[in-house]
Amino acid sequence: MREDLAYSFGVLQIGSWQEHNWLDTVRKLKAKDIPASGRSHYSFLQAAALGWEENSGHLGESLTVDMAEFSAFVAEENRACYVAGIDLYYSCPLTEQGIVLVDTPGADSIHARHTGVTFQYMKNSDALLYVTYYNHAFSRADKQFLAQLGRVKGSFALDKMFFIVNAADLASSSEELHEVVAHVDSSLRTAGIERPQIYPVSSLNALEAKLAGDESSLSVSGFAEFASVFDSFIGHDLSGLAAASAADELHQSLLRVQQRISALSQSGTEREQLIQRLEQERGSYQESLVCLRGTDLSPEIIQETGELVFHVRQRVRLASIDLYREFFHPSLLQEDGGDMKKKFAVSLHDWMSGLSGELERELLATSLRLEKKVDALISREAGKWLEHESGREPRPSLFVKEFSGWATPEIGEGLLTGRFNWKDYWSYFKNPKHFFEGSGREALREALAAPLDDMVKEVADRIQETLSSYYCNEAVRGLEEMADHFEQLWVEWEEELRGIQASGDETDTLIALGKRLAESEQQLRQIS
């Protein structure tokens, strides 16, 4: 909370936040003196000041409340602004399936600057529902959020994004509704989201229909169609991925059972000869694992990282021009009685803050692309090793395992924020007329361009080094994990062979087990 307060003080250029006197500073603020871009921060500070006495003593604590008090924490801004997060336990058919619903801060929220938190939900959630409204035009923050969705969409195994246009009942005709949906579709495609799944709904009409048990009205509301598609996604598409993974595991178990049955069918002499061959081959098998562990993927990773970050710098450079036009705009820098120097300072701060967020989102998306790249490299090397070993005898039943988990490296926030001092550039702004109708705005942009490029390069180079080092280490860990897996398969197989005692009962049991495994695998394949 203190960090959020300090950040809003910085955005509004009202000095540094001090706990002993910040309330006095906020009480002196006048709405008419606040630039348009800072109004959400002004509202936040007003709400925080109103609730400080009641809530500041609870900072850092966890509270358990009933539903009535929960409503107050959500609806009353002077309490809600103090809450970092809420876990609501609510029983309904959806949650009883084990589904957890997460409501993230809106794109225009002051908390939207925490790009890393939002990115983790994009990356790790099973489904994403983006809700917009019938009469809502996409803001700059909306467009930035959607652009991030567009960057990461192609990295997922399934299309898990659903776009809902709420309040569809406001449409005066089906033609008008179609035009609105077409506009949303165009905006999403512009953001890089190909083939978006868009569902116009009236949540109000749907709720009324649900309560009345009116299936016809529920269908007209559009909600029934969305619910049907979403249920199919949860029950079939996601379940299909899990079923396919389970089927692969069953298949590997089946191969091991078959291998054991084959060993049981051999005579004692044949098994002894096989064990002797194992002892002879164990050394070469271990040597091949040493080679796998020693595979150097760093040149490819470093090259890929460099290329990706280079393109990030190019896109950020282009974004800086668009954002500059937006923040140094006549609507924000008017002579309307306000403090023009403060307005100029806020415009410069917000431009750099917006650009910083753009850079952070680009770098986070780059981390996801690198995950997929390194994952593919590890799988490639494991596949090559497997192909080499599969032609040699004797060998256990070998298969490539999935590399476990990817943590996102720390990118940081505010990478560019506060890098420029507005006083160094105030001379370019003589007055609004000269700035916008004359050469002032273009001259300022040119003056900022070179130092900005240097800043972006410095940050990008530093993050590039971080990403390269991180994913090179992850590649080493991945190959080590894969080699350990192959080594364990050998150990388990050899222990099985040495422990076999020929038994008709065991053979019959294994044959029956193999049959059940094959049947279960087939059933799971059908689901997937």
Q: Language-model segments: what does each one mean?
A:
Residues 1-96, 149:
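Mechanochemical coupling/switch segment within NTP-driven translocation systems
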Residues 1-32, 36, 82-84, 96-127, ...:
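Non-catalytic alpha-helical scaffolds
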Residues 89-90, 117-118, 150-152, 188:
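Catalytic micro-motifs at enzyme active sites that drive phosphoryl/nucleotidyl and oxygen chemistry
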Residues 90-92, 105-108, 167-169, 205:
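Short, flexible loop/turn elements at secondary-structure junctions
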Residues 107-110, 124-144, 165-176:
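Conserved Switch II/interswitch segment of TRAFAC-class P-loop GTPases
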Residues 138-155, 178-182:
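Amphipathic helical hotspot of TIR/SEFIR-family domains
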Residues 161, 168, 179, 183-185, ...:
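Catalytic core segments in nucleotide and nucleic-acid processing enzymes
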Residues 173-178, 212-216:
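Short, flexible/disordered intra-domain loops and linkers
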